[in-house]
Amino acid sequence: MTSTSLTDLFTPTGPATTTCRLAESTRSYYKTEQVDFTLDQFEQSAQSLFVRLSSATIFNIRCDDGYTFTQLEAGGYLGLPDDQTAPAYWIPVSPMVRAINADKSITHEKTAVVSGFTLQGDHSSLQFLCPDNSILDLTIWKFTVNSFTQQFDALSAIDMQGTFLWGSHACVNKPGDLYHHLINGAVYDLRFSWPHNKKCFSENEAHALYTAYSGLEKATGKTFYRFFQQQIVLSVIQRQADDGAWYHGMWTDEKECHYRLHTSALHLLMDELDRTGCPQVKEALISGVAFIAKHHDELDCGIWFLHDSLELNEEAMNSGPFQWISKRTLGKRPSNMLVLNTHLDTTIAINRYQSLTDDLQYAELIKSALVSTRTALDLKPANWLYKPLFWAIGLTMLPTEKARQLAAPIRAIKRIAADFLIKKLPDIKARFPRLVMPNGYIDRELSLRTWAVDYQTINLMDLSRYARAFPGEFNEDILNKAMAFTHDTGLIKRYRELAPGKRYATGFWVEALYHRCLAKGDVKYRQWLAKAMLECHDLGFGMAPSLLGSNSEAVPFARQSLYPVPSNSELNIAVLCRPQGFELLIVNHAQHSVEVNWERKTEMLINWRDATQQPISDVALQIPPRQWVLGTGH
């Protein structure tokens, strides 16, 4: 049996094996023969501890003083002391038993078994069983100031509205949900991923969580959301390899690097650097940018940033789970699949790094990437073939209610497209290379034998970001047409009819519209955004992380201001901080009218309009069922 007390848990014996110090937080590692400790220190009044027991035994935790533990709406259990001068403890999630492989991917997990409970006077203890060939994980917070525990008790509607995650496409609904992702000091994807059925590290998940908690901190003013952000930053820096990379091993049992996840780490570090200027964050960022800048392919027209390290050579591609076509389109290496979204995101990330740090060593690389992007998007061979082809394939993107109205011959063509034409598309693209299709659909890549209709909205999100980062550097008619196609055909409704793993696309549609609203004043984008927010609510996805206005790529930290926050649980908001002025979109997802009550009001003078753009009074502001209002302020 391994036995310890709550007090002793937070005072590990011996010196720390390693320590990471940031501007506002510190992480220290301690190790005994059977237990690993990861201790995060924030203010003097707040600590978080990850405990990992790595041998088959019973783990006994004693509580030597009088405490009352109660279940929290925020998640987990809060322990309040009888002695008001003693610290409080928060256990956000139940202890878990896990199996991990050599790369620390999680291959199995279940809630730990409580093997015993002892109560003697003011002393109590709880025992958990760690089985053979397993580890036992426990996460616990220690607070020494009452205001922190009061924040957990006073949750508002916005605390619980739910946030969509860019990595796992899951939803975090309450504070304790963080620790389903942040495990033993590292951020994991929530899914047991195809094809090896294991939970892998995910900086994409970390970036979404960081953005979500930045927004919730701004919306609520609660200190623990800032602690969550700092803990995520520590976790990302902890995982960075000596060569500057973040490795994942998702598709193979080797440690391949997924560059989209790598650039998510860069964006997260840039968010934190923009806020704090922390030298340690900058050091990790510099190393990460240097790594990703080297991993590109030389096309005839310019450089192309790769999607993952399997694309470095044909042998690595063959070790992965995909079927692919070996082609040298545009002079690319055969193993480069010409994946659009990661190339766009990496270009945005390195350009953002230049703007933030004034380090211009990658300027020529970015210029070259812009040329290759423009070239790839402008590929338009064989219109005579692609126009009828994507008219037919477009029929498969109609929601069922529209498809049922088609004439019988058209429905037959739809079936042929689904059963045959889509399967032939990779070979057609190999003969006539093209990403942007005549009807407005944008394909994910050029050379994989896959069909990823769910990536349409990811492409739109990244192109919307790209258009803001590089105005005039590509034909925005491509983006405008693709946005209109996605909305007008009913593709968003079609997504909810697809397999569960494909429905997430609506969450990225919201992100795309958010960025488009920041760039354009068109009312239609606000209308589309309101509808998309309703769709995400109805599907249980939560709201996109950027909507609370704290995505620092879109709105630098210095420009993020306080805004009015409704207290109604029926309402969701989108905060649009544009150079031309502030906008607040409020959407009522209920089936009844709602009068807006305010959790927080500001001094800002706001003019309100309803969904038909008619002015309305801010006195007893009413929103009809399934409708929205838009406020503008300066």
Question: What is each PLM-predicted segment?
Answer:
Residues 8, 14-85:
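Long, solvent-exposed N-terminal ectodomains/accessory regions
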Residues 31, 35-53, 565-605:
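Carbohydrate-binding surface patches
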Residues 59-130, 607-612:
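Trp/Gly-enriched beta-strand surface patches
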Residues 132-139, 143-152, 616-634:
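C-terminal beta-strand-rich structural cap/linker in extracellular carbohydrate-active enzymes
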Residues 161-199, 223-246, 282-306, 312-326, ...:
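Long, well-ordered core segments of solenoidal/helical folds
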Residues 207-223, 264-280, 345-360, 457-473, ...:
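Well-ordered alpha-helical scaffold segments within catalytic/enzyme domains
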Residues 248-285, 289, 332-333, 339-351, ...:
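Aromatic-rich carbohydrate-recognition surfaces in CAZymes
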